[in-house]
Amino acid sequence: MKRFEDRISIHAPASRVFGYVSDFTRHGEWAGNGLEVTRSGAGPVAAGMTFSTTAKQFGTQREQSTIAELTPDTTFAWDSTGALGRVHHWFALSGEGDSTTLSKGAETVDPTFLAKITSWKLSKDIPNGIHRDLANIKAHLEGPAA
């Protein structure tokens, strides 16, 4: 299926941006649809760690997410498995001083029948969601409470 990606410039160092987006339990602060995240295990966050997520979109959506890549200040990626199949998500960061370019992307790599028959809708919803998420992250990191 298609690969979607967008980027935004944030006035914050890469280490701060990375710390925020790589904290999976805080994704509900910027993601839409009432996302709730529960960590499945203990110990330091690392590739292979799993999380359970619940969101409200067309009913309750439950997914299992596994961290696929964690490279400090550079990349945070995870795979989510749920009603749409397996979707690979990522953040890529490029920082220079107090400014960071943050990219966010998603690609359905193992779609279910549901994902295939709704691909026309997903091809609109996913890019809109990525754009909204990036704007919310920027607002949080640059806002007065930052």
Regions found by a protein language model. Name each.
Residues 79-132, 137-139:
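Beta-strand/loop substructures that line and gate deep hydrophobic ligand-binding cavities in soluble
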Residues 7, 14, 34, 50, ...:
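Structural motif
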Residues 5-7, 62-64, 88-90:
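Well-ordered beta-strand positions in beta-sheet-rich domains
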Residues 25, 46, 109:
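Short alpha-helical
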Residues 38-84, 96-101, 132-146:
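Glycine-rich portal/gate segments that line the openings of hydrophobic small-molecule binding cavities
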Residues 4-5, 14, 54, 80, ...:
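A general structural-boundary detector
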Residues 1-42, 146:
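Hydrophobic ligand-binding cavity/cleft-lining segments
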